[in-house]
Swiss-Prot record:
This is Competence-stimulating peptide. InterPro entries: Bacteriocin_signal_seq, Competence_ComC. Residues 1-24 form a propeptide. One of its GO terms (molecular function) is pheromone activity. The keyword Secreted applies. GO terms for biological process: establishment of competence for transformation. It comes from the Bacteria. Keywords: Competence, Pheromone, Secreted. Belongs to the ComC family. It comes from Streptococcus mitis. Acts as a pheromone, induces cells to develop competence for genetic transformation.
């Protein structure tokens, strides 16, 4: 459960980053992480 909470916080931070910095690289990283999150 601990990992899930950390992931949620991490995703929140990433979304904030996405809003601040609209870059392709960050988007790609977020997508990879999102796919990994969906798998589990």
């Amino acid at each position: 459960m601990k990992n899930t909470v950390n992931l949620d916080k991490f995703v929140e931070l990433k979304e904030k980053d996405l809003q601040n910095i609209q870059g392709g690289e960050i988007r790609q990283t977020h997508n990879i992480f999102f796919n990994f999150f969906k798998r589990r």
